[in-house]
């Protein structure tokens, strides 16, 4: 493995974004300001009161964006009164220009929690997945243009202050979720109850209207569940502007993720959208969707194997064509959440730690060239002035993979005064724990680390200064 700090190859991309934000109760003052509601300040509160928020842990991870899809499944976010268009604007026959016809209360509260975590909301316009026997919010709207006008006013509420709203920084607005799910297998779709042709018409109308209203915002979608046949067919006939194409991939290897990313990028370039961002905004470790392999996958997501998959995928995606990763899911209470326990709320799980580890690189900003020929070895590095960092992971989906020693050559950062390297270890028994430090001299030096499968290291590097 090799890191060349002389060679800056771009910016570190937001690979540590999530679906959904922190669980936090927000107190809003009469002047509109708001802060976390601290249950510990309540007079006569029981001394053993369970922590009921993960705001601090969420903020410490430095999560840059939170997509709000499926937020309405969780009562702490507001449940059936939150985020989804049909929950905010409940009477589709009402006047979409009248603020009284909108119920923003719970969604306001949820978004404030994200703002308190310094996390920008990536807003999914549409509805949560409906696995129920009867579908409601995933049916095609009665009037496509009116639906777009409703969304226009939701955007104005959160970015322009309409209807006693806000001027939050919310750049990404996504139209719908997984319209391709069961699109050609004869099953009833839990995400789009119409035809492919209807969705194409719907998307064209909605995206064109919203981009006309908000040329400065990023309008895109449609959060494709992963069908490349559907993706090509959709992009080949798309008429509307497309600032980003969002898609999903659940897989057991980084290769599967990167192969799909390459196909998406190829279709975008081929069909006239070379500037559109490719955003993978649902992903997690999944070996299969049925049987014992599915159960195994769910078990691993919050364990060290799931954590290593997260770290490896972040590093691989940084080197590839993906512009943003959004892990599914940080929503408490779902079995997809490998980051946070539900009780106590602030307890973090193994898959949490790659997020603050990657954030160390993200804060440095400048991605530098890395080379790896080590099977199962993943590496990503960044620098800014006299500071640098390296994220290193050993991930192989085969649980029987033997431990290795990884040798890393680091070029272009140190000098005769020395570079101090701090080591932080994530494995079965360490949670991004400080594991020692060493000083290395010269413009080029090597580090060798023992790397059992599913191990990650964060190396924080600083130039030593003469007194």
Regions found by a protein language model. Name each.
Residues 1-57, 61, 465-467:
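Mature N-terminal, pre-catalytic/accessory segment of carbohydrate-active enzymes
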Residues 5, 43-58, 153, 157, ...:
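Short, acidic/polar
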Residues 18, 114, 154, 173, ...:
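Conserved, mostly hydrophobic/aromatic
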Residues 61-252:
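Substrate-binding cleft and catalytic face of glycoside hydrolase catalytic domains
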Residues 195-310, 320-322:
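Noncatalytic carbohydrate-binding groove/subsite architecture in carbohydrate-active enzymes
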Residues 284-386, 395-398:
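Aromatic/acidic polysaccharide-binding cleft in carbohydrate-active enzymes
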Residues 374-417, 453-460, 466:
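Carbohydrate-binding surface patches
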Residues 405-453:
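Acidic, Ser/Thr/Pro-rich beta/coil linker or hinge segments at domain junctions
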């Amino acid at each position: 493995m090799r890191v060349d700090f002389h060679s800056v190859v771009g910016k570190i991309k937001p690979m540590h974004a999530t679906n959904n934000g922190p669980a936090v109760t927000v107190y809003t003052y009469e002047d509109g300001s708001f802060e976390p509601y601290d249950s510990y300040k309540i007079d006569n509160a029981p001394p053993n009161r369970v922590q009921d928020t993960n705001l601090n842990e969420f903020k410490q991870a430095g999560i840059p964006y939170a997509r709000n899809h499926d937020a309405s499944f969780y009562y702490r976010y507001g449940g059936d009164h939150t985020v989804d268009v049909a929950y905010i604007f409940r009477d589709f026959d009402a006047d979409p220009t009248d603020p009284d016809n909108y119920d923003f209360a719970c969604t306001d509260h949820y978004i404030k929690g994200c703002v308190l975590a310094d996390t920008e909301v990536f807003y999914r316009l549409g509805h949560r997945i409906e696995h129920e026997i009867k579908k409601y919010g995933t049916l095609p709207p009665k009037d496509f243009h009116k639906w777009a006008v409703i969304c226009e006013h939701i955007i104005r509420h959160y970015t322009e202050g309409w209807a006693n709203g806000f001027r939050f920084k919310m750049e990404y607005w996504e139209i719908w979720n997984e319209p391709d799910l069961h699109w050609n297998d004869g099953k009833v779709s839990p995400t789009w109850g119409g035809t492919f042709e209807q969705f194409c018409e719907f998307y064209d109308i909605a995206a064109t209207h919203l981009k006309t209203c908000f040329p400065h915002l990023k309008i895109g979608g449609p959060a494709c569940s992963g069908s490349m046949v559907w993706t090509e067919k959709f992009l080949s006939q798309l008429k509307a502007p497309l600032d980003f194409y969002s898609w999903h991939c659940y897989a057991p290897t980084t290769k599967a993720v990167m192969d799909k990313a390459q196909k998406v990028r190829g279709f975008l370039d081929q069909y006239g959208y070379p500037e559109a961002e490719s955003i993978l905004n649902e992903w997690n470790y999944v070996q299969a969707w049925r049987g014992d392999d599915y159960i195994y996958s769910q078990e691993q997501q919050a364990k060290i194997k799931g954590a290593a998959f997260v770290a490896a995928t972040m590093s691989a995606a940084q080197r590839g064509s993906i512009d943003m990763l959004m892990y599914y899911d940080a929503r408490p209470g779902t079995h997809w959440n490998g980051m946070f326990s539900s009780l106590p709320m602030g307890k973090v799980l193994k898959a949490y730690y790659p997020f603050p580890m990657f954030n160390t690189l993200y804060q440095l900003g400048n991605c530098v060239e890395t080379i790896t020929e080590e099977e199962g070895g993943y590496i990503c590095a960044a620098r800014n002035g006299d500071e640098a960092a390296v994220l290193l992971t050993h991930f192989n989906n085969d649980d029987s993979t033997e431990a290795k020693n990884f040798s890393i050559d680091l070029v272009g950062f140190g000098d005769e005064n020395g570079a101090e390297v701090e080591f932080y270890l994530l494995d079965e028994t360490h949670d991004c724990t400080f594991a020692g430090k060493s000083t290395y001299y010269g413009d080029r030096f090597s580090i060798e680390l023992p790397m059992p499968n599913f191990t990650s290291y964060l190396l924080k590097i600083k130039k030593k200064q003469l007194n």
